[in-house]
Swiss-Prot record:
Main location: secreted
Designated name of the protein: U-actitoxin-Aer2b
Modified how: Contains 5 disulfide bonds.
Coiled-coil region: none
Keyword Secreted carried by entry: yes
Membrane-spanning ranges: none
GO MF annotation list: toxin activity
Subcellular location: Secreted; Nematocyst
Statement: the UniProt record of this protein carries the keyword Disulfide bond: yes
A cellular component term, taken from the record's GO annotations: extracellular region
Originating organism: Anemonia erythraea
Amino acid sequence: GEIECRSSECCPSGKHLCEGGFVHYCCPNDRYMSCGFLGFGTCYCWKAAYYEYGSTPTC
């Protein structure tokens, strides 16, 4: 399912912190994060049909 992201000091400018279960990634703020089947797959930052890896938060 889709994971909501929010602004955070732990992510660089233009990225929001996305928290899903045990994973925390920074995604561009125009994207949402999804971690695949039941949330146990690899997490990506999605926008329409395009995705990219999230970056690691600094805190």
